[in-house]
Curated annotation (Swiss-Prot):
Family of this protein: Belongs to the neurotoxin 07 (Beta/delta-agtx) family. 01 (aga-2) subfamily.
Role played: Insecticidal neurotoxin that induces an irreversible spastic paralysis when injected into insects. Modifies presynaptic voltage-gated sodium channels (Nav), causing them to open at the normal resting potential of the nerve. This leads to spontaneous release of neurotransmitter and repetitive action potentials in motor neurons.
The species this protein was found in: Agelenopsis aperta (North American funnel-web spider)
Protein name: Mu-agatoxin-Aa1b
Annotated SUPFAM superfamilies: omega toxin-like
Tissue-level expression: Expressed by the venom gland.
One function term, GO molecular function aspect: sodium channel regulator activity
Free-text note regarding domains: The presence of a 'disulfide through disulfide knot' structurally defines this protein as a knottin.
Disulfide bond positions: C2-C18, C9-C23, C17-C33, C25-C31
Annotated Gene Ontology cellular component terms: extracellular region; host cell presynaptic membrane
């Protein structure tokens, strides 16, 4: 099951972001899925 926009994600262990999203780790605390466009 993939993580949707603005949900938490992890580059290394999951959950993975849904299609069209990437895992951004700039926000605190932790990583969030952001649109890749």
């Amino acid at each position: 099951e993939c993580a949707t926009k603005n949900k938490r994600c992890a580059d290394w262990a999951g959950p993975w972001c849904c299609d069209g999203l990437y895992c951004s780790c700039r926000s605190y605390p932790g990583c969030m899925c952001r649109p890749s466009s």
